[in-house]
Amino acid sequence: QLFPWSRYLTGTCGTAPSDSFDPLAYWVEQAHARNLRLEAWVNPYRICAGANAQSDFDALPDSSPAKQHPDWVVSCDGGYYFNPGIAEVRQLICDGVSEIVSKYAVDGIQFDDYFYPSTQFDDAATYQASGSNLPLADWRRDNVNQLVQAVNTAVHQNAMQAGCRFGISPSGIWRNRGANAFTGSATHGFEHYSSSYADSVTWIKNGWIDYICPQIYWQIGDTAADFQTLANWWSHQVRGTDVQLVLGLAAYKIGDSQYGDVWANDGCGEIGRQLDLAAGIQDIDGCALFSYQNLRGNDTLFQTVQERWK
């Protein structure tokens, strides 16, 4: 009721599939018939992005919240995003999540790693109007924190499926250890705390999520972001909490030379070593592969995983 039908279903945004076919209801039914969980993946703020962002935005029907409330929308880096600093935007996202979990027997909601798309996000007017005494970066993180806390409440209050969970899959580095972040990981890479304004450690410590799935998409021994270093660091963040830790693994890198010799020549072996390493670290509850299309059709990878998960 809140958002138009996706163009990926029929080719036209806002057009429903024929014969009242509901793909999500079908997927849930078929997954549960096979003893599989199905969680709905949500990218909370992004409206349109990529090379066709402008034409995709123009093609949105008038019923789209982005068209009904243009003052909620910010153009950034060639894409269009809902402004996280607007309370009505946070409510819209919560309502959208509530609609999913109350009408479908999904087993969870998972947010992807996209929050603020850039440090250059044009929200100066919203920041000024808020009257906040927080510095801009902290204000942005607080906006995301408010959304995470509210969505957690919405999931657990409105879910029709028993045991429905709320999890987030952020990029693999919270903060790099340094002069201003003594508690960060011993890494050198993109950090979501300062670049996306996503304070995942605060979510964990406050119990606002049921699980966290950091995308540790580097190899064991990587000089900038070693897989083992990050696996151990994240395990310490969830220790003593009720938040489960699932490590995201980069199956998409297998066989691709742009990611280096290890991934190009022994990618399946690398995934196997990462699975073995994770299994031996306290407080790691499992691993997730990104993505299924990389598992399907790769018999070696399938066997690598099956041997460990049978």
Residue ranges with predicted function:
Residues A31, I93, I100, I109-D112, ...:
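Conserved, mostly hydrophobic/aromatic
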Residues S6-F21, S75-C94, S132-N145, H188, ...:
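The substrate-binding groove and active-site-proximal loops of carbohydrate-active enzymes
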Residues L24, V28-E29, E39-K103, S194-A198:
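Active-site-adjacent "subsite" loops/lids of carbohydrate-active enzymes
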Residues L2-S6, P44-C48, F115-P117, G172-N176, ...:
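Solvent-exposed loop/turn segments at secondary-structure junctions
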Residues Q1-N43, T126-A159, D226-A231:
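Aromatic-lined substrate-binding rim segments of carbohydrate-active enzymes
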Residues R37-A49, Q110-Y114, D138-Y193, D242-I254:
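Aromatic-lined carbohydrate-recognition surfaces of secreted/lumenal glycan-active proteins
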Residues W5-P17, R46-D77, Y114-S132, R177-F190, ...:
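Aromatic- and acidic-residue-enriched segments that line the glycan-binding/catalytic groove
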Residues Y197-T223, W234-K310:
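Substrate-binding cleft of secreted/luminal carbohydrate-active enzymes
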